[in-house]
Design a protein with these regions (language model features):
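Flexible, active-site-adjacent loop/turn segments at secondary-structure boundaries
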Residues: 6, 94, 211, 215
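Intrinsically disordered, low-complexity polar/charged tails and linkers
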Residues: 1-15
Length: 227
C-alpha cells in the first residue's frame, strides 16, 4: 500500500525535481532582512543544504537541496530568527513585496508590509485559497508593478501621519497576463486589511481552483466585481 507524500506547500516547501530533495522559501516583507537573519539563512543553507541561497523576484529567499528529515529543525531555526515561510507557496497570501526601497517614506511602506504579513501569514481563514494571492506596495505608479499584483497598494498621500492608498486589483502575469484595475481610491491605511480580507473572501468563495483573482474579475466584469 503506497502512502502519498506530505504536501508541504503551505509551509513554503516544494519538492525538487531531484529525488529526495526539497526547497524552503522564506518570506521577507518588503524584501528586507536583518544582518542577523541573513546569518541564520546562511547557516541553515550551509548546514542543511549546499551553501547557496536563491533570491526571488518577489524579494523572498530560497534554500535548496534540503532533506525531508531536516525540515522541522530548519523551521525552528528560522523561527528563532523571526523568519517565517508559512504561505510562501501554495494557495495562500504570498510574501508582501515593495519595489520602492530607497524612496522617501519607504519605512512607512515597510511597516505596512510587516503588518500585512503578520496578519495573513499562517492565518487559517486565508489559506487553502484557489491559487496563490500576491500583494505589492508601491510609493507611486512609476514602476507599474502594481499592475501585476492580485492587490497593488499605491501610496496616494502621506502627510500629518495619515497615509492614503489607491488599491489596484486583479493583475497578473503568466500565460494570460492581465493588468490590474483601479478598485478603490485614497483609502486610509487602517482600512487596508479589512478591504483585502473582503477581496479574499470573494475570491475564495467564487473562484474555482486553480484560478487566480484575475480570472474571477474577468468573468464577473470589473464593475460587477467592484460592486
Amino acid at each position: 500500500m503506497s502512502t502519498a507524500a506530505p504536501d508541504y506547500r503551505l509551509d513554503g516547501i516544494y519538492k525538487q525535481r531531484q529525488d529526495d530533495f526539497f526547497m524552503q522559501r522564506v518570506k521577507l516583507p518588503a524584501g528586507v532582512i536583518s544582518a542577523g537573519q541573513a546569518r541564520t539563512v546562511a547557516t541553515v543553507s550551509t548546514r542543511f543544504g549546499q551553501g547557496t541561497v536563491h533570491l526571488t523576484t518577489r524579494g523572498s529567499m530560497e534554500i535548496h537541496w534540503l532533506k525531508e528529515k531536516d525540515l522541522p529543525q530548519i523551521k525552528r531555526e528560522l523561527a528563532k530568527a523571526g523568519l517565517t515561510s508559512r504561505g510562501a507557496c501554495g494557495g495562500a497570501v504570498r510574501g508582501i513585496t515593495c519595489g520602492s526601497q530607497g524612496v522617501q517614506g519607504f519605512p512607512a511602506l515597510e511597516s505596512l508590509a510587516r503588518r500585512l504579513q503578520r496578519h495573513f501569514a499562517g492565518n487559517p481563514r486565508f489559506e487553502r485559497l484557489p491559487k496563490k494571492f500576491k500583494i505589492g506596495i508601491e510609493a507611486d505608479l512609476t514602476g507599474r508593478r502594481h499592475l501585476i499584483q492580485d492587490v497593488g497598494l499605491v501610496l496616494a498621500k502621506s502627510d500629518n501621519n495619515i497615509s492614503l492608498f489607491d488599491i489596484w486589483i486583479a493583475g497578473g502575469l503568466g500565460k494570460e497576463p492581465q493588468s490590474g484595475f483601479l478598485f478603490l481610491e485614497r483609502m486610509p491605511e487602517e482600512r487596508i486589511i479589512l478591504i483585502i480580507e473582503a477581496i479574499l473572501r470573494v475570491y475564495a468563495a467564487h473562484a474555482p481552483p486553480p484560478k487566480r483573482l484575475k480570472f474571477l474579475a474577468k468573468e464577473f466584469g470589473k464593475l460587477n466585481f467592484a460592486n
